From Swiss-Prot:
It comes from the Bacteria. Associates with the EF-Tu.GDP complex and induces the exchange of GDP to GTP. It remains bound to the aminoacyl-tRNA.EF-Tu.GTP complex up to the GTP hydrolysis stage on the ribosome. NCBIfam families: tsf (TIGR00116). Residues 82-85 are annotated as: Involved in Mg(2+) ion dislocation from EF-Tu. The lineage of its organism: Bacteria, Pseudomonadati, Pseudomonadota, Betaproteobacteria, Nitrosomonadales. Pfam families: EF_TS. This is Elongation factor Ts.
């Protein structure tokens, strides 16, 4: 049986919001499998699914850029080791340079991006290595997405929340104000996809199994259990899909209703949350403090 560490219990508590002993027991029953332990706790406690895909742990920023003609745009997440470096002007400038580059060039993967040239003539990888040497931290380009509108009436809108959450949305109809509202809504409500048709069958089946197990414990007849499960699935889909969510600026109206009112539609979106799904090593806080102290000493000496 896998050893159940205090760090594992802490992580499961952060995901579920449940007590230490409950989490430890679930991890023991699941032989240390974090996902299986979360499912066990949800079945037993009726807890909701964790909205976040993972714990936000790594540092860095999200940068966005949209071309002047509004036809193309890009979102990129660049990671570093401490929040101190994430606020550094050179680091921020690098991230924004990448967003601009990705807007103008169709780049398919990280390898191609590493070999692409920035406006100063250096390759992205050369500039990244120089920045690592200058700032003394590992710097990585985690992910990026390029949007290219298809039709004359299509638009792009972006929103950055403290550079830690970034959104780019591709929509048709409406006006720039609608685009901004949609991007802000996505940042706040964090939908998984646009509509229920886009929810992965695997995710839906996992939720159905959990809801079925929860409902079965009620002891009610099978037909009532089936209706309970269908109702919970419908509610779940409304929570995770953009069209089903209540609009943040008017909760009495769903996003689907808002779009119908504006004769508009959402073609797709990208949502990045810095460090989502990346785990920090234990002791990172102390390391971050020491890194900041060391950086301050270097700046004072120079």
């Amino acid at each position: 049986m896998a050893e159940i560490t205090a760090q594992m219990v802490k992580e499961l508590r952060e995901i579920t919001g449940l007590g230490m002993m409950e989490c430890k027991k679930a991890l023991t029953e699941a032989s240390g499998d974090m996902k299986a332990a979360e499912d066990l706790l949800r079945i037993k406690s009726g807890a909701k699914a964790s909205k976040a895909a993972g714990r936000t742990a790594a540092e860095g920023i999200v940068a966005a850029h949209i071309a002047r003609d509004g036809k193309s745009g890009a979102l990129v997440e660049v990671n570093c080791e401490t929040d101190f470096v994430a606020r550094n002007e050179d680091f921020i400038g690098f991230a924004h340079s990448l967003a601009e580059l990705l807007t103008t060039e169709s780049i398919g993967d990280n390898e191609a991006l590493a070999n692409a040239r920035l406006s100063n003539g250096e390759s992205v990888e050369e500039f990244r290595k120089a920045l690592v040497m200058k700032l003394g931290e590992n710097i990585s380009i985690r992910r990026f997405a390029r949007h290219q509108v298809a039709g004359a009436q299509d638009r792009l809108a972006s929103y950055l929340h403290g550079a830690k959450i970034g959104v780019m949305v591709d929509y048709t109809g409406g006006d720039p104000a609608l685009g901004k509202d949609l991007a802000m809504h996505i940042a706040a409500s964090k939908p998984v996809c646009v509509s229920s048709e886009q929810v992965s069958p695997e995710l839906l089946e996992r939720e159905r199994q959990i809801y079925t197990a929860q409902a079965a414990e009620s002891g009610k007849p099978a037909d009532i259990v089936a209706r309970m499960v269908d109702g919970r699935i419908a509610k779940y889909l409304a929570e995770i899909t953009l069209l089903g969510q209540p609009f943040v600026k008017n909760p009495d109206q769903t996003v689907k209703q808002l779009l119908a009112e504006k004769s508009a539609q959402v073609n797709g979106f990208t949502l990045y949350i810095v460090g989502e799904g990346i785990e920090k090593k234990s002791g990172d806080f102390a390391a971050e403090v020491m890194a900041q102290v060391g950086q301050a000493k270097q700046e004072k000496a120079s």
